[in-house]
């Protein structure tokens, strides 16, 4: 395997030479440079969470995520890296040595390792290629009470309902077509994590959830206890949509999507702390504002167009605030906004 030296954040590390392989997917060890933002944001989150943490990344690839955690967050006490590929394991060891980082490296099936680590991890980060569904039960079993579960899903087309049968088979949910389909996909993922957590007697409290062009990501505090798990399930429901109107309902019909997480997607205080490090601050400030709005959907400007024309997003937000409606832009759509109001209230103000 031909290697080159790469740099991400504060870490130098070896990766398979991209000039040697047709794509990152054909390389013997997987490294996705487009996930750098994901890893950087995860480092910021860990900085706010604690210190001396036992962190497990069961799908490590080159090991860059775990190594960045160890070097940049100052929060890691024990680092556990794993990959089912022997070539990946050798590369992980090489990268740990290059950076002077101590870590335990395993060559196991991810689920097997997570079962062996039962109740020992403060942080479990599931970052697969594709769906995280096959790993979540074992991830919760490895987690300690009040641990942090982090989950990435790159099967976004499935989560937003583009492939209905696969969505139902994989996530046991039904997603209808709506203008706010990105938020439905994100809430679909968080809802699935919550249901798996409850089956393992955990509740979840999302602290940081978002969408990027090719993936969904959620990180949540997990609290052990049957009663807590039952309470967590109260945050599940269905979102009904018809002719621009939206509402939360408790049953599935031809106009509703779910089951979905209808509670908060994140903690504004946590994201505010993350934004203080000066990295991706504008993005994090947008999330902070979004998390403060309870409505589990967003609106898009074309929904309020008259004769094919609608005001700019900035003007729309200004008009709504003047009308006494709390509203903010969303990171999930370039022409979208979230508001503590229904469609008719917004349309009335914009038509004045």
Swiss-Prot record:
One of its GO terms (molecular function) is tRNA (guanine(26)-N2)-dimethyltransferase activity. The keyword Ligase does not apply. Coiled coil: none annotated. S-adenosyl-L-methionine binds at residues 39, 65, 83, 109-110. InterPro entries: SAM-dependent_MTases_sf, Trm1, TRM1_arc_bac, tRNA_met_Trm1_C. GO terms for biological process: tRNA N2-guanine methylation. PROSITE patterns: SAM_MT_TRM1 (PS51626). SUPFAM superfamilies: S-adenosyl-L-methionine-dependent methyltransferases. Its EC number is 2.1.1.216. Keywords: Methyltransferase, RNA-binding, S-adenosyl-L-methionine, Transferase, tRNA processing, tRNA-binding. Residues 4-350 form the Trm1 methyltransferase domain. The keyword Methyltransferase applies. It comes from the Archaea. It catalyses: guanosine(26) in tRNA + 2 S-adenosyl-L-methionine = N(2)-dimethylguanosine(26) in tRNA + 2 S-adenosyl-L-homocysteine + 2 H(+). Belongs to the class I-like SAM-binding methyltransferase superfamily. Trm1 family. PANTHER family: N 2 ,N 2 -DIMETHYLGUANOSINE TRNA METHYLTRANSFERASE, TRNA (GUANINE(26)-N(2))-DIMETHYLTRANSFERASE. Dimethylates a single guanine residue at position 26 of a number of tRNAs using S-adenosyl-L-methionine as donor of the methyl groups. This is tRNA (guanine(26)-N(2))-dimethyltransferase. The gene is trm1.
């Amino acid at each position: 395997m031909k290697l080159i030296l790469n740099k991400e954040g504060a870490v130098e590390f070896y990766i398979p030479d991209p000039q040697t392989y047709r794509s990152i997917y054909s390389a013997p060890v997987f490294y996705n440079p487009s996930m750098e933002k994901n890893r950087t944001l995860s480092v910021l989150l860990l900085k706010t969470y604690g210190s001396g943490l036992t962190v497990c990344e069961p799908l490590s690839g080159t090991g860059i995520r775990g190594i960045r955690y160890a070097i940049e967050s100052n929060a890691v006490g024990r680092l556990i890296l794993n990959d089912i590929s022997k070539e990946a394991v050798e590369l992980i060891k090489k990268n740990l040595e290059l950076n002077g980082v101590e870590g335990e490296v395993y060559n196991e099936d991810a689920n097997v390792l997570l079962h062996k680590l039962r109740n020992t991890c403060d942080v479990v980060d599931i970052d697969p290629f594709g769906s995280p569904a096959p790993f979540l039960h074992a991830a919760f079993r490895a987690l300690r009470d009040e641990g942090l579960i982090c989950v990435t899903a790159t099967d976004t087309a499935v989560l937003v309902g583009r492939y209905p049968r696969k969505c139902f088979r994989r996530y046991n949910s039904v997603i209808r077509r709506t203008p706010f389909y990105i938020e439905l996909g994100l809430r679909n993922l968080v809802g699935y994590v919550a249901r798996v957590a409850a089956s393992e007697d955990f509740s979840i409290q999302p602290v940081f959830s978002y969408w990027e062009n090719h993936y969904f990501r959620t990180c949540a505090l997990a609290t052990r206890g049957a009663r807590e798990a039952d309470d967590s399930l109260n945050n599940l429901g269905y979102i009904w949509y018809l002719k621009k109107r939206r509402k939360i309902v408790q049953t599935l019909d031809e106009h509703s999507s779910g089951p979905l997480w209808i509670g908060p997607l994140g903690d504004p205080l946590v994201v505010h702390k993350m934004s203080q490090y000066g990295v991706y601050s504008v993005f994090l400030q947008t999330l902070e504002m979004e998390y403060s709005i309870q409505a589990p959907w967003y609106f898009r400007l074309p929904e309020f167009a008259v004769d094919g024309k609608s005001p700019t997003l900035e003007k729309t937000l200004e008009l709504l605030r003047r009308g006494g409606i709390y509203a903010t832009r969303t990171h999930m759509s370039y022409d979208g906004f979230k508001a503590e109001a229904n469609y008719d209230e917004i349309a009335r103000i914009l038509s004045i």
